[in-house]
Amino acid sequence: QLFNSDGKSSETILRGLVRYERSPSMDFEAGGEIAYNMLERDQAYSIGGVPEPLPSASVKVEETRGELFGKATWRINPKWTLESGLRLESSTISQSGDADQEKNFFFAKPRLLATWTPAANNQLRLRLERTVGQLDFGDFAASAEFADENVFGGNVNLQPESRWVAELTYEKRFWGEGIVSIGLRHDEITDAIDVIPLEGGYAAVGNIGDGTLDQLVLNVTVPTDKLGLSGGKFGFRNTWNHTEVTDPTTGEIRPISGIRASQATITFQQDITSWKLQWGGAWIPLLGQKNYRPDQISGWRGHDYYELWAEYKPTPTLSIRGQVNIWDDFNVERTEFGDRETRPIAFVENRFIDPRTFYQIRLRKTF
C-alpha cells in the first residue's frame, strides 16, 4: 500500500475590539473578526502499484468567515454579577477539485453567565451558551492510517458541530491558594462529528446526527504549608464524561469516538524560593479511549503515566528546565468486522506497546 499526499494551507485573521465602561458596575464590549482559511491537497492511493480511486482525493477548500460580537457585564451588587453576550457568525465554504460546491452557514451564539458569591471564598456560577466548533479542513480530503489499516475518503458535505451548553460550577477557596471546584455540565449536540460509512468500503469524518454529553469535573488544590511542607501544592483533577450518539452503521446508541470516560491526574509541585527552584510531578493511574468506525472498533488502555520536572531560575530572565516522562506498557485492541450490516467479527488484534521514556532539557532567556 502506498499513500502520497502533497498540499499547502494558509490562514489570515483580522480582529477589532472596543470596550466601554459606563460605570464601575457596568461595562460593554463589542467587536468583529474577519478570517480567510485555505487548504489545498493532492493525494494518491495505490495497492501493489495499482491506483485506487478515493473520494475527494484532490481538493481545495476555502473559507471566508465573519463574526460580530457584543458583551455586557453588570455587577448588580457584591454578591451577584451577570454577563450576557451574543456572537453572530457567517461563513462561506467553497470546494474545488474532485468536488465543486459552495455552502453558506449562519450561527447565532448567545451566552449568559451568572455568578453568585453568597459568602467570602464561595462562588456559584451558571453558564448557558451555544457553541459552534471549527471544522478541520483536512477532513474534506482523503487520508490514511496504515497502522490500523484505515483509508479515509474526504467528505464534501461536512458541516460544523454546534452545542447548547448548560454548566453549573461551585468553587470554594481556602488556605490562600487552596481550591475545591465541582462542575456539572450537559451538552445538547447537533450535527455531531464522528466517522460515517461511504460507498466502496471507505469511511470519512462526517456528521452523524444529534447527541448528548453529561460531564462531572472535580478539581482540588491543597497548599501544604499548613501541613508542614513550605511552598508545596497537592492537586487532584478528573473529568467524568458520558456521551451518547446514534451509530450511523448499526443504528445503536454508543459513546462518541475519542472522548475519554474518565482520566484522573494527581499532581504535586513545590516552590523553593531560597534555591530559586521549582519542582513537581504528575501521575495518571489509568488512561485510554475508544474509537468507532463502520468496519471496526479500536481503542487503547494504559496505566501509570509519570511526569517529573524541575526548573531553576538563576536570574529573573534565565530559566533551565529538565523533564522526564515515563509511560508504562499499554494495550491497543482492534476488533475488525467482516461485514458492515451483519457485523460478524473477522478478527481481534491486540498489540502491546512499550513506549519510550522522554527526556527534555530547555534553556529559556527573555529580554
Labelled PLM ranges:
Residues 1-101, 117, 123, 182-183, ...:
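Face-selective signature of the C-terminal outer-membrane beta-barrel domain
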Residues 1-5, 13, 51-58, 94-102, ...:
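Extracellular loop and loop/strand-boundary signature of outer-membrane beta-barrel proteins
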Residues 7, 57-63, 103, 132-181, ...:
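Outer-membrane beta-barrel signature, preferentially recognizing the C-terminal barrel domain
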Residues 14-20, 68-74, 112-116, 168-172, ...:
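Residues on the lipid-exposed face of transmembrane beta-strands in outer-membrane beta-barrel proteins
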Residues 21-25, 77-81, 117-121, 163, ...:
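Outer-membrane beta-barrel channels and translocator barrels
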Residues 184-188, 206-290:
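Gram-negative outer-membrane beta-barrel transporters
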Residues 311-367:
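C-terminal beta-signal and adjacent terminal beta-strands/loops
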